[in-house]
Amino acid sequence: MLHIYNTLSRTKEPFKPAHAGQVRMYVCGMTVYDYCHLGHARMLVAFDVVQRWLRASGLAVDYVRNITDIDDKIIRRAVETGRRIGEVTEYYIAAMHADERALGVQPPDREPRATQYVGEMLDIIGRLESKGLAYRAEDGDVNYAVRGFADYGKLSGKSLDDLRAGERVAVGSAKRDPLDFVLWKSAKPQEPDDTKWESPYGLGRPGWHIECSAMSKTLLGLPLDIHGGGPDLKFPHHENEIAQTEGAFGGALANVWMHCGPLMVDADKMSKSLGNFRTIRQTIAQGALSDTQAEYAVNPREAEMLRFFIVRNHYRSPQNYAPDNLVDAQNALDRLYQALQNTAADGQGVDWSEPQAQAFKAAMDDDFNSSGAVAALFELASEANRTGSARAAGQLKALGAVLGLLQQDPPAYFQSPTRYSAAAREQGAPAAALDAAAIEARIAERAAAKAARDFARADAIRAELRAAGVELDDKPGGLTQWRRA
């Protein structure tokens, strides 16, 4: 049975949709004012894997992922570039879709845009106002009265009394309490006309948090089975969503809350605000990029490497970005494709009674543990290389498909040049044998994973090394010796 870690309860729980066999899943998507970076790639791929596994498990999924197409950052980009809001958002939506296609991210079933649901947002604001949870401020904004919602902080574990004004929430002089947040922003004279809507409160536009409350409730109803998003959304965005939706309608907004871990760069989260980001297209483009073209030529080998880089780690664990880590991911993916190139797959699909398929399923049913699932892929690759088994190769390819991997033709895959693997300098060359330094580095990474009790990751590293012809022997005292098989 599938178990999911619920951020709300802080425990791993058996997953039971409100309606048997049907899953209503909402994920907070992009604010479209710039290109997607690798941190966004992690969120997109993580929830793509989630919905793929739910469907592979026989569940009917209604997957909604929104687009925020009105926001302060979008307005600034439009003003800076002299373009209309719609021109900015349409361009970056097209760019986002190009990135998703490159990474093998399947489109959500529905992809609403915030500007299509302003009427529904105003309805929720009116409900909150009638219940004393929203008020009109002197500056024309409509704010949420946070202290009127007794459960505020239940998702993030933050206490209102412990939150200091100005630390995480901007202080506004028109707010009754510095922790209150805006539901409706009054129009400013200098703002473009296409950022303003008529409302009972005068011209203005919605605040960020109210958008998701309106779209999720309108499209999926309450409660959602799963609400997901990036690590930085737990507070304040998701906390505020709960306050709005549950304050307006009563009952739970979502039964399960999921948050993927951050992508780190030198101990900091990758983000545009820190300036330490690398875009998806910079990482996987084939040839030059243009800031006037949303579409771009993709290197399919590098694109799948980036997806593999994300999938081989558990979605909740922090993941570190470094160029060497991409090289390591490329070499590991090459070894899986080499097994498929060496042995023709039987094409029979997944045999779930087979031991490695059972291990794969057990891992995925354990909070979508794709790291453990990847370990099963390497065991199959090792078997295919050792025995020439078409069945093992077929299982490898079919299980890879569940994760959105290993569907390229192996000879064509190796013909694509890659910037991330020395083994690709010769067309069609198999992954080069790991040298001693690389093996020792992988053993050190495995030891760190074991120390952090991430045993699935440790097992995955062992399986990757075995597929590369390296056997490990754990000795007493934490020492690990290795030998070439």
From Swiss-Prot:
Pfam families noted in UniProt: DALR_2, tRNA-synt_1e
Residues spanned by motif 'KMSKS' region: 269-273
Binding site for ATP: K272
GO CC terms in record: cytosol
Disulfide bonds: none
Binding site for Zn(2+): C28, C212, H237, E241
Subcellular location: Cytoplasm
Cofactor binding note: Binds 1 zinc ion per subunit.
Entry's family note: Belongs to the class-I aminoacyl-tRNA synthetase family.
The protein's name: Cysteine--tRNA ligase
